[in-house]
A protein has these predicted regions:
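Glycine- and small hydrophobic-enriched segments that form the cores of compact globular domains
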Residues: 75-89, 110-117, 121-125, 149, ...
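A short glycine-rich, hydrophobically flanked beta-strand micro-motif that places a catalytic Asp/Glu
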Residues: 137-150
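Active-site microenvironments that recognize anionic phosphate/pyrophosphate groups
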Residues: 1-98, 206-213
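Secondary-structure boundary elements
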Residues: 131-138, 201, 205
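Short histidine-centered catalytic/ligand-binding loop motif
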Residues: 101-125, 176-184
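C-terminal helix-cap and adjacent tail motif
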Residues: 47, 162-213
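Active-site helix/loop of acyl-thioester processing domains in fatty-acid/polyketide metabolism
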Residues: 120-136
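Histidine-centered divalent-metal-coordination microenvironment in nucleic-acid enzymes
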Residues: 105, 147-175
C-alpha cells in the first residue's frame, strides 16, 4: 500500500463534517480535559477548508535572504546567548509565561536538513536549557515546541510552564499564554539570566543583552 495522498486524507476527513461544513468538537479528547482553556458548551470548529494548491512560502526559504546570512548582532535586545554555531533569543515582545526562548542554529537548515554536527549538538543544548528553565522558582516544567510554518530556518521554542498552576499544563499552554497578562521585561530578563549562564558554562559562547538587563 502506498502512502496516502493529501487529497485522499482530506476526503476521508470531509466525510465526517456536518451540514454546516464543520467537524464536531471532540469533547471526549482534549476539549474535555480540565486543562483545556475554553468552555465547551459554546465552542465550535471553523468550517473545514479544502487543501490549498501549494504550501505557502516561508520566510528564509532562500538562504541568502534568511537572517542567518548576516552575523549575530551582539547588541540585539532579544539576544540571550550565542556561540559560534547557535543563538538563543528571549521573547521580549510580550510573553505571558515566565520564559519563552528561541533556540536556532546559525547555519541555514531546518529540522529535516540539519548537518550531522548541528544535529549532534541539538540534544545537549535543549537539555541544558530545559534543566535551567526547570530550575526557575516560577517554573514547574519546560515545554518544547517546533512548528516552522512561518519561517524556514530551524527555530525551537522552549517555554517555562508556570509551577503549580495546574490549568496551564500540557499542549493547551500556548492557548493560555496568549490570554495571560504580559510578564514585565525586567522579570523576563531575570528569568533568562540563569539559563544564559548555564548555556555559557556548558557550551561556551557569550551572554547577550537580554540576560544582562
Amino acid at each position: 500500500m502506498e502512502p496516502e495522498s493529501i487529497e485522499d486524507y482530506y476526503e476521508r476527513i470531509a466525510a465526517h463534517v456536518g451540514a454546516d461544513g464543520r467537524l464536531p468538537v471532540a469533547v471526549e479528547e482534549m476539549p474535555g480535559w480540565d486543562i483545556f482553556p475554553y468552555e465547551v458548551d459554546s465552542l465550535r470548529l471553523k468550517p473545514l477548508q479544502p487543501p490549498a494548491a501549494t504550501e505557502p512560502a516561508r520566510r528564509g526559504e532562500d538562504a541568502a535572504a534568511c537572517w542567518c546570512a548576516n552575523p549575530v548582532d551582539p547588541d540585539s535586545d532579544s539576544l540571550m546567548w550565542w556561540n559560534e554555531r547557535w543563538k538563543v533569543d528571549l521573547g521580549f515582545e510580550g510573553s505571558g509565561l515566565p520564559i519563552m526562548a528561541w533556540l536556532s542554529p546559525l547555519v541555514h537548515c531546518d529540522l529535516g536538513t540539519m548537518p550531522p554536527a548541528v544535529a549532534a549538538e541539538l540534544g545537549s543544548l535543549v537539555g541544558t536549557m530545559a534543566g535551567a528553565i526547570e530550575g526557575l522558582p516560577s517554573v514547574g516544567r519546560a515545554q518544547l515546541a517546533k512548528y516552522g510554518d512561518g519561517g524556514a530556518h530551524l527555530h525551537l521554542l522552549l517555554m517555562g510552564r508556570p509551577a503549580r498552576m495546574l490549568q496551564l499544563r500540557g499542549s493547551p499552554l500556548l492557548d493560555w499564554e496568549e490570554n495571560l497578562p504580559r510578564v514585565p521585561s525586567e522579570v523576563l530578563a531575570s528569568n533568562g539570566r540563569p539559563v544564559a549562564r548555564a548555556l555559557a558554562e556548558a557550551h561556551g559562547g557569550w551572554i547577550g543583552p537580554a540576560a544582562q538587563r
